[in-house]
């Protein structure tokens, strides 16, 4: 990211919250490991929380910048390029560039390749635990490549870097009051969750993440910290376990 955020644009805070003063903000490019490699030295854990829900061409359809037919054809294409080089084959000092001719940021590039690149650097730096914010499932309105690239990242990280304790957090839809547009979407998703629950989860195949319980972003963050503090937590962490980890952290903080 670009360092300390502009708080009014990303949260309900008009000024920097108190906790942010304890954070050492760094400017780096996830696709250029040399820009953050030194920050990994001595780190106990690394968290990858970047990703895209909609690709640029899909947004273009919604904003009218691209024709619906052309945009949707590209958005739902079976395959797209990730980086211009496999992150596992990247040479020291080499940056990863978008593999699409128009420089598009694709699911393959952001959801998969950037995570693998970061995990590789973390492993080489001796980091003990790596956490990847994945997803519970896809959704009918999203291209299948959204969830496929998430699962590909999980698979590659777990198989290529077994020395690290790899944790894959799989939440459903994330919401927060600071992002007003997420609130009505969370309400709709919660309705889907209730409907799916009443059928014993039999609608999961149809609804995907739309049938999972939406979670507040802060709750997921607490679960991430708790998972990295517990050496027994590894592999995929589903919605129910995310809630359990967050509740455990809450109870401990109340003592």
Report the location of each language-model feature.
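Short, flexible active-site loops
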Residues: 97-103, 129-142
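Conserved Class I SAM-dependent methyltransferase catalytic core
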Residues: 115-123, 127-135
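Short, polar loop motifs at secondary-structure junctions
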Residues: 1-5
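Eukaryotic N-terminal targeting leaders
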Residues: 7-14, 247-255
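NAD(P)H-binding glycine-rich loop region in Rossmannoid oxidoreductase-like domains
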Residues: 9-117, 121, 228
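SDR active-site strand-loop-helix element
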Residues: 49, 130-136, 169-171
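Oxidoreductase cofactor-interface core, primarily capturing Rossmann-like NAD(P)-dependent enzymes
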Residues: 125, 138-254
């Amino acid at each position: 990211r670009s360092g300390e955020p502009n708080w009014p644009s990303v949260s309900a805070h008009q000024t920097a919250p108190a906790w942010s003063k304890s954070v050492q903000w760094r400017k780096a490019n996830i696709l250029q490991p040399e820009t953050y490699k030194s920050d990994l030295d001595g780190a106990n854990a690394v968290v990858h929380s970047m990703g895209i829900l909609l690709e640029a061409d899909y947004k273009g359809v919604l904003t009218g910048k691209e024709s619906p037919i052309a945009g949707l054809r590209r958005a739902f294409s079976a395959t797209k390029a990730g980086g211009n080089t496999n992150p596992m084959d990247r040479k020291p000092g080499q940056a990863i560039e978008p593999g699409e001719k128009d420089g598009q940021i694709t699911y393959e590039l952001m959801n998969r390749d950037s995570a693998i690149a970061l995990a590789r650097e973390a492993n080489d730096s001796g980091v003990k635990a790596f956490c990847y914010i994945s997803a519970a499932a896809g959704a009918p309105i999203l291209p299948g490549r959204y969830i496929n690239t998430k699962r590909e990242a999980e698979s590659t990280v777990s198989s290529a870097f077994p020395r690290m304790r790899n944790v894959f957090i799989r939440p459903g839809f994330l919401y927060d009051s600071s992002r007003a547009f997420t609130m009505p979407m969370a309400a709709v998703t919660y309705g889907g969750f209730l409907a799916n629950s009443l059928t014993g989860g039999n609608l999961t195949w149809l609804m995907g993440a739309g049938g999972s319980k939406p979670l507040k972003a802060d709750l997921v963050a607490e679960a991430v910290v708790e998972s990295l503090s517990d050496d027994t937590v590894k592999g995929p962490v589903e919605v129910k376990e995310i809630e359990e980890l967050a509740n455990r952290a809450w109870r401990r903080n109340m003592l």
